[in-house]
A protein has these predicted regions:
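Extended compositionally biased segments used for macromolecular assembly or nucleic-acid engagement
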Residues: 107-110, 134-145, 151, 157-164, ...
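Amphipathic, charged-and-aliphatic alpha-helical interface segments
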Residues: 42-43, 47-49, 161-202
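Residues that scaffold, gate, or flank divalent-cation-dependent active/transport sites
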Residues: 1-102, 107-109, 116-117, 121-124, ...
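Mature hydrolase/peptidase catalytic cores and their serpin-fold inhibitory cores, especially
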Residues: 351-490
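A glycine-rich phosphate-binding loop feature that marks nucleotide/adenosyl-phosphate handling sites
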Residues: 139-146, 277-289, 332-343, 381-396
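A residue-level signal for conserved active-site and pocket-lining positions in enzyme catalytic cores
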Residues: 58, 99, 135, 200, ...
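DNA-contacting surface of Y-family translesion DNA polymerases
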Residues: 3, 64, 186, 190-334, ...
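Structured, non-catalytic alpha/beta "coupling" segments that mediate domain-domain communication
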Residues: 84, 117-156, 215-223
Length: 490
């Protein structure tokens, strides 16, 4: 096995900074009542803010400082989101809380062209989620974790290289991991002069066991591959839900779209792992607390893609159309993205001589964009309806490909031409000259089953008007035998 450890030492900070596009200073406070700084971004640290500093001191150094209390629940959710995204690289993933992800990457090396290209790809695309991490590769998960924390970028792909890579690591790594060494054990080792792992390995194992440091030897055995280190596998969710708290409430669409892009990067990984696409997803705006007099007000936007798609640029475009269509009623405090029912994507069919000149637009994207911009009900299309009366021979239907409103069987269409532009109400005209009548008459007598008011009895003609247009006119067969124009052919 070959393990890639992805360590996020600044996860407590990045769960808040990943949703912002500007570099306002930000610091994270520890638990109450002390409320001391546990992490700060580079802008805050440039002002003198450091971990361990009190809240008042931090604000005095950086008056524009944004302070957020540490959110362990957000950190756990972020680790799960990253694990879900990492499914695009390997299906063998293990969570190693509080800030580490373990990927078993041996089967993925050929697909990504080797170990170095794979690690580069992981690090680069992690940035699209808004996170920055440290990577290392080793034959055991614990060794990979320690190397990622203390020697990021290390790539140890054989057991023979483990000892030389791990021996120089400081003693403090023993406090890192799922089963860390106790402070008493570390004090014991420091007291007898141990400074690095090589010093501990030279000590008698029996002596360590008598001094209650058995956990230390077990850690080293797992790291150096002397005993197995089984890990539970992460099972990705069947339904994708990701939430992004914003650093500060905002009603700026561009700021929201920056956060949407972060969420879509995670969705892309979830879909990649399934080789699937979506037809729709939901973007939920969580408004600022106490908006409209109560907490928890949120507004869902169902974004229809117009076709089965995995294209995040398409998703971003349609999200923009939804967010810019109407003003936001209040500042948004957080974004949430929800998606389910992914369907397998089929490879695109290409012509042997396919080229740029033969490419066509995407009608599904056009339809989805128009609906996002104008509203769902503002976009409709015409369909034939089985009725001989021209004004009732059509109807509005949903233009979606999945709509059940479109006719499915063969249609009994008239043999004579019909104009595309039909007037809502026929307009009276003078009796036309005989030479202007090009075809006809076509007699239409129908509607008696709907009552006298709906019955028509007409003779239709195709004629040329005085302004050289082709028009569709008729004469009533009932007195007073008036003439009317009903539509235009051009």
């Amino acid at each position: 096995m070959l393990w890639c450890a992805l360590v996020l030492p600044d996860l407590a900070l990045q769960v808040f900074t990943r949703g912002r596009s500007e570099a306002a200073p930000l610091a994270i406070l520890g638990p109450r009542p002390q409320l001391r700084v546990v992490a700060a971004d580079s802008t805050a640290m440039a002002c003198g803010v450091e971990p361990g500093m009190g809240r008042a001191s931090a604000l005095a150094l950086a008056p524009g400082l944004h302070l957020r209390e540490r959110a362990p629940a957000l950190e756990r959710a972020a680790l799960i989101d990253i694990a879900t995204w990492a499914g695009r690289f390997t299906s063998s993933i293990s969570l190693d809380p509080p800030d580490t992800l373990l990927l078993e990457v041996q089967p993925s090396l050929r697909l990504f062209g080797g170990l170095t290209p794979l690690c580069t790809r992981i690090g680069d695309t992690l940035g699209e989620l808004g996170f920055v991490g440290q990577l290392a590769v080793a034959p055991t998960p614990l060794a990979a974790r320690w190397l990622a924390r203390c020697a990021p970028g290390s790539q140890i792909d054989t057991h023979a290289g483990l000892a030389s890579a791990l021996d120089p690591l400081p003693l403090a790594v023993l406090a890192d991991g799922a089963e860390p060494a106790t402070p008493a054990s570390l004090d014991l080792l420091t007291g007898i002069g141990a400074r690095v792992l090589a010093d501990v390995r030279r000590l008698p194992r029996s002596g360590l066991a008598r001094r209650h440091a058995r956990a230390v030897t077990a850690q080293l055995d797992r790291a150096y591959a002397r005993i197995p280190d089984p890990r539970p596998w992460f099972v990705p969710p069947e339904r994708y839900v990701a939430r992004l708290p914003l650093p500060a409430p905002t009603d700026q669409v561009d700021t929201l779209l920056f956060g949407v892009r972060r969420l879509l990067a995670g969705l892309s990984g979830w879909l990649d792992a399934r080789q699937a696409g979506l037809e729709r997803f939901t973007l939920v705006l969580e408004y600022e607390r106490h908006y409209q007099g109560h907490e928890g007000y949120e507004e869902p936007h169902e974004i229809v893609l117009g076709a089965l798609s995995q294209d995040m640029a398409r998703c971003q475009l349609l999200a923009r159309e939804h967010l810019t269509r109407n003003p936001l009623p209040a500042p948004v405090d957080a974004l949430r993205l929800e998606a389910d029912n992914p369907n397998p994507l089929t490879p695109p069919r290409t012509d042997l001589f396919d080229g740029d000149d033969g490419q066509q637009g995407d009608p599904g994207l056009l339809l989805a964009t128009l609906r996002a911009r104008l509203g769902h009900d503002a976009v409709r299309c015409l369909a034939p309806h089985p009725d001989h009366r021209p004004e009732r021979a059509w109807r509005w239907i949903d233009p979606s490909p999945t709509s059940n409103a479109a006719p499915t069987g063969p249609l009994d269409l008239p043999s004579s031409p019909r104009p595309l532009w039909l007037l809502a109400t026929p307009r009276p005209i003078a009796r036309p000259a005989a030479e202007s009548l090009l075809t006809g008459p076509e007699r239409i007598e129908a509607g008696w089953w709907d009552g006298p008011a709906a019955t028509i009895n007409r003779d239709y003609f195709v004629a040329r008007s005085h302004d050289d247009c082709l028009v569709w006119i008729f004469q009533e067969r009932q007195p007073p035998h008036g003439w009317f124009i009903h539509g235009y052919f051009n």
